[in-house]
Amino acid sequence: MTSVQQPRTLAEKVWDSHVVVRGTGEGEAREPDLIYIDLHLVHEVTSPQAFDGLRLAGRQVRRPDLTIATEDHNVPTIDIDKPIADPVSRTQVETLRKNCEEFGIRLHPMGDAEQGIVHVVGPQLGLTQPGTTVVCGDSHTSTHGAFGALAMGIGTSEVEHVLATQTLPLRPFRTMAINIDGSLPTGVTSKDVILAVIAKIGTGGGQGYVLEYRGQAVEEMSMEARMTMCNMSIEAGARAGMVAPDETTYAYLKDRPHAPKGQLWDAAVAEWDSLRTDEGAQFDAEVHIDASTLTPFVTWGTNPGQGVPLGADVPDPELMADEEERLAAEKALTYMDLTPGTPMREIPVDTVFVGSCTNGRIEDLRAVADVLRDRKVAAGVTMLIVPGSMRVRAQAESEGLGEIFAAAGAQWRQAGCSMCLGMNPDQLSPGQRCASTSNRNFEGRQGKGGRTHLVSPAVAAATAVRGKLSSPADLAKSVK
């Protein structure tokens, strides 16, 4: 007598289909499962020691055809034809090139037409596909979950394990449904959604979970919007974030360089259509957010969970009942040099950064151009616009976006991680305040002493024009 398959979540389906060896034992004593990895993304920062480990053990890369590398974290976004000035950054980039050549790994170096941030390059090449497992030595690998992939950031020792075996020992995760019910109001983006989610559940609320984003608002999002949302799952403490594949997914993937072709495409779509959470499947936790109540969101503190609607005021720690939360807020406000009760819209900025693996895609740049068209960046404000890849830059140029950016007084750069993190020349100086479309606002994240407010691309552009945290609606009001 055959057993009846229990209803499963999307994450469970992908996990089960990739188990090479099932771990034994129960509870805390349970051994990890051995999971097969379909795609391994590599960059210059977390890979050098992993390759050294292969050499010491006399091993080769098991599946170089399932491994792809790109230079992104340390690369400059101007003068890319010149040697990298910082010796540590230069060494890491040169080491990646040598390692990829030695081990037969495909690399997209600076200046290459496909170079860019690893989490932008993978999807645009069609390498990220539904139902696959994706890993990278980078926290924001969760980006790829927008395609219905199980995508996780891993450490350097795990990078070595995947290079050597194309597998990874992992313990099963819990699952959490994030339901965004209803449609988003005009002017509200997926960046606002994920900031609101993190503010609701906290930076540790997703710890040990794979988040599945569901609901009408998610179904109505573009693939690039879904990538933004999944990208920041890690900021809620989650291991991964996922969205079930649908017609929007297939339309994005079709005809990408590495997407299946012809009959293989038809077979793939038929398989991908099964990647839905079954009716009756049980999540370990569920969260509901009414999309109609959301407005543009912005962070005020030093972690992504310290955020409020743009129309709100800087919170008062004295009104926070939880002592730990209150102490964290006091510390954050001291670092950010903010006074409780200050309207968020009255906070001035020195710098605006548009880019990163969160918001460096073509739709993000179009949103910025829509705001900047026939407007100027405010006096005293520096605006950097950095495409997530050279392909994104080329597309933006073909649409005339670069001309709009230049006319507004913004700096239009080459591809790279740029000001998302202080590992390349694009950094804040101590005390500078930045409205940033990136994913982390930790102390010193964008440069020692720099202060970061996380925002959507549209809010970033409006902020650049007004010189204070603003939405496009604020600019429209100022014209009347």
From Swiss-Prot:
TM regions (residue ranges): none
Cofactor(s) needed by this chain: [4Fe-4S] cluster
Quaternary structure note: Heterodimer of LeuC and LeuD.
Region (Disordered): 431-454
Keyword 4Fe-4S tagged: yes
One GO-annotated biological process of the protein: L-leucine biosynthetic process
Family per similarity comment: Belongs to the aconitase/IPM isomerase family. LeuC type 1 subfamily.
Pathway the protein acts in: Amino-acid biosynthesis; L-leucine biosynthesis; L-leucine from 3-methyl-2-oxobutanoate: step 2/4
Record field: compositional bias (Polar residues): 431-441
Keywords attached to this entry: 4Fe-4S, Amino-acid biosynthesis, Branched-chain amino acid biosynthesis, Iron, Iron-sulfur, Leucine biosynthesis, Lyase, Metal-binding
PROSITE patterns on file: ACONITASE_1, ACONITASE_2
Protein name: 3-isopropylmalate dehydratase large subunit
Cofactor note text: Binds 1 [4Fe-4S] cluster per subunit.
Protein task: Catalyzes the isomerization between 2-isopropylmalate and 3-isopropylmalate, via the formation of 2-isopropylmaleate.
Catalytic activity: (2R,3S)-3-isopropylmalate = (2S)-2-isopropylmalate
SUPFAM superfamilies linked: Aconitase iron-sulfur domain
